[in-house]
C-alpha cells in the first residue's frame, strides 16, 4: 500500500510502498479517506532536534485522519465493517493508575500514532478498536479529519468555565483559532487573540475572535483599554509556546485568573513568579484530548452550530503532498487536507 514516510534522517517526507497491515485481535483496519497535516508533522518534515531525538527511521507518519473500517479483530465489539471513524492518536497502556482511573490522557506510557508507531499517512491504518471514534452522518470527512487538533483546542478551551468571561489566547495557529471559535460558542464575552502573523490573525477573526492583536504593532494593554477592560483577563489559553507571549499573558491576567497551557515554552523560559503567586493564578498543563469526553464535546458543539470550517484553507490530492507540506510551512494557511480517495 501507499504511504508517506520518513525514510531518511534528513529534511523531507517520501511516498513509498509498504505491506498491508495485519489486524490484531482487538484492532480495526481503517481505509483512510482524508488526512490533515499537523504541526508535529512539520517538525518531522523539517527534521528538527525534537524529531531527531524522537522519530524512528524509517516510519510512516501522520495522525490526523478519517476513514472507513474494512476489517475488525475477532475480539472487537461495538464496531463493524463500513463504520466511518476517526481515532485517538494516543495509544495508552490501560494498566497504569491514570488509565485505570479513567484519566487515559495522562498515561505515562502513551505511544503516539505517527510518532512512536506507524502513522495514518497511508492507504490503511491499524489501531486498537478502543481508539476508534464513530463519526455521525452530519459531520463531514473534512471536519472529522481534523478532530485531533480540534480536540486539542476543545480540551484547552473547556478546561475552565468561559461563560461571561474575558479570554486571552496567545498564538493564532489553527488550534488557537479553533479555540477562539469554541470560546465564543460557549459564551465568552471578549475573546482576544495575539500573534505576529497577519494571515493567521485574519483567520482567527473569521473564526469568531472579538479582537485580534498583532503584538509587533500593537500593545495588548492598549487593546484592553480600547475594549473597556479594567481588571485583566479571566482565562488565558496559551497556544504559542512563545516565551514573550506567555510573559505578556501573565502580566495581563486578572487576579484569580486561570491559564490552560497547550503551547510548550522553552526549557529555560524565565517568568516573573510574582505574577503567578500574588495574583493567585491557576496554571493547568494540557496534553492531547480527554478520552473520550473531549470527543463527545466536539461532536456536540458541531451539531449545535459551531462552525470551524474556515480553518481548512487548502486541499490537495495525496500525490500532491509536497505542495501540502510547502503550504503548511509557509505560514499562510490554516489546516491542510490530503485526499486519499
Curated annotation (Swiss-Prot):
Residues annotated for NAD(+) binding in this entry: 175, 195, 200, 262-264, 286-287
Q: Which GO terms describe its biological process?
A: L-threonine catabolic process to glycine
Q: Which GO terms describe its molecular function?
A: L-threonine 3-dehydrogenase activity; zinc ion binding
Pfam families recorded: ADH_N, ADH_zinc_N
Assigned GO CC terms: cytoplasm
Per UniProt, where does Zn(2+) 1 bind? 38, 63-64
Question: Major location, coarse class?
Answer: cytoplasm
This protein's record includes keyword Zinc: yes
Site note Important for catalytic activity for the proton relay mechanism but does not participate directly in the coordination of zinc atom, residues: 148
Pathway assigned in UniProt:
Amino-acid degradation; L-threonine degradation via oxydo-reductase pathway; glycine from L-threonine: step 1/2
UniProt remark on cofactor binding: Binds 2 Zn(2+) ions per subunit.
- Cited SMART domains: PKS_ER (SM00829)
The lineage's top-level taxon is Bacteria
Q: Which cofactor does it need?
A: Zn(2+)
Residue positions of the active site: 40 (charge relay system), 43 (charge relay system)
Listed HAMAP family: Thr_dehydrog
Q: How does it assemble?
A: Homotetramer.
The protein depicted here goes by the name L-threonine 3-dehydrogenase
Q: Which organism is it from?
A: Marinomonas sp. (strain MWYL1)
The gene that this protein is the product of is tdh
Amino acid at each position: 500500500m501507499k504511504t508517506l514516510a520518513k525514510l531518511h534522517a534528513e529534511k523531507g517526507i517520501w511516498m513509498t510502498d509498504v505491506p498491508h497491515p495485519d489486524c490484531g485481535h482487538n484492532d480495526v483496519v481503517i481505509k483512510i479517506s482524508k488526512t490533515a497535516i499537523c504541526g508535529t508533522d512539520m517538525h518531522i518534515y523539517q527534521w528538527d532536534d525534537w524529531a531527531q531525538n524522537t522519530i524512528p527511521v524509517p516510519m510512516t507518519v501522520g495522525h490526523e485522519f478519517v476513514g472507513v473500517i474494512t476489517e475488525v479483530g475477532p475480539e472487537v465489539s461495538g464496531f463493524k465493517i463500513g463504520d466511518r471513524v476517526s481515532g485517538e492518536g494516543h495509544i495508552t497502556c490501560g494498566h497504569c493508575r491514570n488509565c485505570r482511573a479513567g484519566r487515559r490522557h495522562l498515561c505515562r506510557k502513551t505511544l503516539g500514532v505517527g510518532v512512536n508507531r506507524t502513522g495514518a499517512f497511508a492507504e490503511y491504518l491499524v489501531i486498537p478498536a478502543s481508539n476508534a471514534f464513530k463519526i455521525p452522518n452530519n459531520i463531514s470527512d473534512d471536519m472529522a479529519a481534523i478532530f485531533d487538533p480540534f480536540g486539542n483546542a476543545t480540551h484547552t478551551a473547556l478546561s475552565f468555565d468561559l461563560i461571561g468571561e474575558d479570554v486571552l489566547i496567545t498564538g493564532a495557529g489553527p488550534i488557537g483559532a479553533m479555540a477562539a471559535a469554541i470560546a465564543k460558542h460557549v459564551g465568552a464575552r471578549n475573546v482576544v487573540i495575539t500573534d505576529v502573523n497577519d494571515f493567521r490573525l485574519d483567520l482567527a477573526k473569521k473564526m469568531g475572535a472579538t479582537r485580534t492583536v498583532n503584538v509587533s504593532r500593537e500593545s495588548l494593554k492598549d487593546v484592553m483599554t480600547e475594549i473597556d477592560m479594567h481588571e485583566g483577563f479571566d482565562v488565558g489559553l496559551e497556544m504559542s509556546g512563545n516565551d514573550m507571549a506567555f510573559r505578556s499573558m501573565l502580566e495581563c491576567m486578572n487576579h484569580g485568573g486561570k491559564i490552560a497551557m497547550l503551547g510548550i515554552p522553552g526549557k529555560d523560559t524565565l517568568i516573573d513568579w510574582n505574577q503567578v503567586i500574588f495574583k493567585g493564578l491557576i496554571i493547568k498543563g494540557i496534553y492531547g484530548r480527554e478520552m473520550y469526553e473531549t470527543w463527545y464535546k466536539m461532536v456536540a458543539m458541531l451539531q449545535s452550530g459551531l462552525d470551524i470550517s474556515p480553518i481548512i484553507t487548502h486541499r490537495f490530492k495525496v500525490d500532491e503532498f509536497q505542495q501540502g507540506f510547502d503550504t503548511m510551512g509557509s505560514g499562510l494557511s490554516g489546516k491542510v487536507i490530503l485526499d486519499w480517495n
